[in-house]
């Protein structure tokens, strides 16, 4: 009679301390709780490997350390969505910043979808990061984002920004335990900071001659706008969102850069500041504004004619009420869309106020730089660079420079700041700020050109002031400005000069009639 085998079947589960292992089909899984959350990671078909992993995780749980498998696997597209939502709802980053982050991380999503398919963010290794850099260097993109624009390869600074953004994305994944514990950020091994920038556009600051030719090329609508940028260092968005009467004091000569959250606009750094105005700029703004006491300081070109903005005459309070009325009720389930709806409503509000779009400032700037033979200069922030350079040339105190530029918080807390607590305890008096700014800008031709421009417009409006003192001042001011003859060859698309528009033969002719401007009629 044959013997019968009584071998016991292998157990399908076992426990090691706080960790239970069980067999499902042919694969071993672990089950344990960490920080109140249940984890059930897959180990593999080998029972011995499952036993070793269970013992390792149990030791980590007993020691209070993060478990080796205690992370939440997530795909890279889902990780990116969570990260952007974190910036939207938790960090409250600006919509422009979120848009830039979305565009930068889209390159990573394209890489994962087209070149290296990876199921999870935890599968992205340093070798994939290096492959991603090679992919970026070979990719051709439209520099302005338009589908039909000529494409070119990414610049080094663009590649660095994309890599820094993706590195920040994986830092978020580490903090929220979407990567295995003790696994390094795959972008950290690339050493992004050591990637050289070899093809960056040079940073340009206008020379005195370029500044003179640039301002002389402006028409009557452009001149007050760009003179203000030259003499205050404002960002274009700050200039286009100045409101009367709160942001401009022509009696004491101050310009106030203020956040306007209830009107859908805030300063880039959220840092408000006060900027003293030179007397020449005060006189010019008084002439341009006339008796207008509301609306944007600088209005659209069509407002110089018969166009009347729909919201003309509204006060700050009524504008805020109008803003609230224009925001449609956001769906309760679509919390993230509220800011976008508010942003869209703000754009229409400022348009109906007659405000200039910041992009229009850039278009006008590019037209002027083409007219003076510098088509490669395309960014209005060139004027901001020139302003900062003028402060440096005049040895303006670094703290005052930071305040005038709106960089004070970054100076106090920035890396490499040598002033330390001195910057915190230093409070600049308004008269000190005004004195140093005037000393810096007096060396530039802008103030003298402003006087000549205002003298011409005043002469055209009221007639000349023939007093000896006025004529002496006119000769002194005109000596700073080298006039361009009317018959000089010009580009057919370039703006007309002062003398051509006024019908004068030479800029100095009208400068002879320079008087002290009074309270002119509204323009």
Residue ranges of predicted features:
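N-terminal DNA-binding module of tyrosine recombinases/phage integrases
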Residues: 22-123, 127, 307-343, 427, ...
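Basic, Lys/Arg- and aromatic-enriched nucleic-acid-binding interface segment
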Residues: 145-146, 151-156, 160-164, 175, ...
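C-terminal catalytic core of tyrosine-transesterase DNA break-rejoin enzymes
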Residues: 175, 220-227, 231-238, 371, ...
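A short, basic/aromatic helix-end/turn motif that makes direct DNA contacts
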Residues: 232, 241-248, 381, 402-418, ...
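C-terminal secondary-structure termini that scaffold catalytic or DNA-interacting sites
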Residues: 1, 252, 262-265, 272, ...
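Short, charged phosphate-coordinating catalytic segments
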Residues: 171-185, 229-254, 398-403, 483
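N-terminal core-binding DNA-recognition domain of tyrosine site-specific recombinases/integrases
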Residues: 42-46, 84-171, 351-360, 376-382, ...
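Basic/aromatic DNA-contact patch characteristic of tyrosine site-specific recombinases
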Residues: 1-77, 81, 89-90, 99, ...
């Amino acid at each position: 009679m044959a013997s019968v085998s009584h071998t016991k079947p292998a157990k399908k589960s076992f426990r090691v301390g706080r960790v239970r292992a069980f067999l499902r089909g042919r694969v071993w899984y672990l089950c344990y709780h960490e920080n109140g959350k249940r984890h059930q990671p897959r180990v593999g078909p080998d029972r011995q490997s499952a036993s070793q992993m269970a013992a390792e995780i149990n030791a980590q749980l007993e020691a209070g350390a993060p478990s080796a498998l205690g992370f939440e696997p997530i795909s890279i597209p889902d990780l990116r969505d969570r990260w952007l939502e974190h910036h939207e709802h938790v960090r409250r980053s600006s919509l422009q910043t979120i848009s830039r982050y979305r565009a930068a991380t889209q390159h990573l999503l394209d890489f994962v979808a087209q070149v290296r398919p990876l199921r999870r963010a935890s599968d992205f290794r340093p070798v994939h990061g290096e492959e991603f850099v090679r992919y970026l260097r070979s990719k051709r993109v439209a520099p302005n984002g338009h589908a039909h624009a000529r494409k070119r390869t990414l610049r080094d600074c663009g590649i660095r920004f994309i890599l820094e953004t993706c590195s920040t994305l994986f830092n978020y994944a580490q903090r929220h335990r979407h990567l295995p514990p003790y696994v390094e950020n795959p972008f950290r091994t690339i050493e992004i900071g050591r990637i050289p920038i070899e093809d960056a556009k040079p940073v340009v600051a206008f020379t005195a001659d370029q500044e003179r030719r640039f301002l002389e090329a402006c028409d009557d609508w452009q001149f007050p706008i760009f003179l203000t940028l030259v003499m205050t260092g404002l960002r274009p968005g700050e200039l286009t969102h100045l409101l009367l009467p709160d942001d401009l004091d022509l009696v004491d000569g101050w310009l106030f850069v203020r956040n306007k959250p209830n009107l859908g606009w805030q300063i880039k750094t959220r840092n408000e500041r006060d900027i003293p105005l030179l007397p020449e700029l005060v006189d010019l703004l008084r002439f341009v504004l006339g008796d207008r006491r509301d609306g944007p300081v600088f209005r659209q070109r069509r407002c110089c004619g018969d166009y009347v903005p729909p919201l003309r005459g509204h006060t700050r309070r009524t504008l805020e009420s109008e803003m609230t009325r224009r925001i449609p009720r956001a769906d309760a389930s679509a919390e993230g869309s509220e800011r976008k709806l508010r942003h869209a409503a703000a754009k229409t509000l400022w348009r109906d106020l007659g405000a200039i779009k910041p992009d229009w400032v850039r278009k006008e700037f590019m037209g002027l730089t083409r007219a003076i033979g510098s088509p490669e200069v395309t960014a209005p922030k060139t004027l901001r660079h020139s302003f900062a350079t003028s402060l440096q040339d005049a040895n303006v105190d670094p703290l005052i420079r930071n305040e005038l530029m709106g960089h004070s918080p970054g100076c106090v807390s920035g890396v490499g700041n040598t002033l330390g607590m001195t910057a915190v305890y230093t409070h600049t008096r308004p008269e000190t700020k005004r004195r140093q700014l005037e000393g810096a800008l007096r060396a530039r031709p802008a103030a003298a050109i402003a006087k000549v421009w205002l003298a011409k417009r005043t002469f055209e409006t009221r007639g000349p002031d023939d007093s000896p003192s006025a004529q002496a001042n006119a000769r002194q001011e005109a000596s700073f400005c080298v006039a361009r003859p009317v018959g000089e060859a010009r580009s057919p698309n370039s703006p007309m000069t002062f003398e051509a528009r006024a019908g004068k033969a030479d800029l100095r002719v009208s400068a002879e009639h320079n008087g002290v401007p009074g309270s002119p009629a509204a323009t």
